[in-house]
Amino acid sequence: MSQMENSTKKVESVANVEVVTTENAKVEQKPTSPADAIQLKVNANSTIKNLKTLVSIVKLTESGAHIGLNPKKWNPKMASYIHAKRSNNHVIDILKTILFLDRAYKFLQEVSQNGGTVMFVGTRGRVVKELIKAEAERTNSFYVTQRWLGGTLTNFTNISRSLKKFNSNLALLESEEINKYSKKEQIAINKETAKLEKFYGGIKNMKQRPDVLILVDPVNDVNAIKEARKLNIPVIALANTNADPQLIDYIIPVNNYSVKSITLILGVLADSIAELHGEPTKIVGRPDSEIVLPETKSNWKQNNYDPSKRGYNPKYVNHKSTFNKFNNKKPVDSTTNEIKTNVIKAETK
């Protein structure tokens, strides 16, 4: 066997992701896409190849699951989960994403088989909160999308009192007993219930502590992890390059700043519970054509600013006609305005 056949070759991808693979064949396989480049390494890795395909590599790369944060923000403890450094970002080893996702998937199925309960936690971003709520409701799990209240797990006795008060108010508002209260008292009860709904709406039916926590951002919600570790509650977390893997029991190295990648990973984890109960899955076992990722829009669009809103500054608008568009006026030349003002001044004199 020649030295050329045993040499390690580098495969360059379109998305600036470099994948190293060892080829023993004489014919060199050239990838045509980032997913194909990664697939070459998957075929050479028996550990990855024998795993159940939860989500395709094409969808993972399409969602940007491999894109890490700026190296300035990284945690050195995540070095073993980082494949390379490209431009201003680290590149997450997507093969380890697949490997650890399968590990978390199987663990969740074991918990569900034993009748365990799951709590989804994510308090960053409106879209992520809505996604967490949807997946939790789909699997009859608990969820926390507002600020993590200290003692949610460690001081469950006090939390149980608040939950009891919340459920009592809900039952009161739905019954005819509420009519016995004065209007002022009804308003006070509604305000109290709305406040409790904000923080306890996702755990109102929780009778005991959950058996597993699933976190979207272990850095932002580190207090939830600290409480879980005190009680030996396993934690599954989507970890970017700034996370501390030593705090996480079942880590999934992935881009948790992308709504698309969060949608994929949370969908797979929720499918592990849904599949066990005979419910239809959203990601697992479905072709890529049936998996719809959310469309993301840029946060900064100058032409979408409304001049009637507070803080509007015309100097940040690219074209002068943009301002007139919101006022339903046609653009008027500045020289015409000067002529009109001069005529008005002459008439007043």
From Swiss-Prot:
Pfam families: Ribosomal_S2. One of its GO terms (molecular function) is structural constituent of ribosome. It comes from Ureaplasma parvum serovar 3 (strain ATCC 700970). One of its GO terms (biological process) is translation. Belongs to the universal ribosomal protein uS2 family. PROSITE patterns: RIBOSOMAL_S2_2. HAMAP family: Ribosomal_uS2_B. GO terms for cellular component: cytosolic small ribosomal subunit. The keyword Transport does not apply. This is Small ribosomal subunit protein uS2. Residues 302-334 are annotated as: Disordered. Keywords: Ribonucleoprotein, Ribosomal protein.
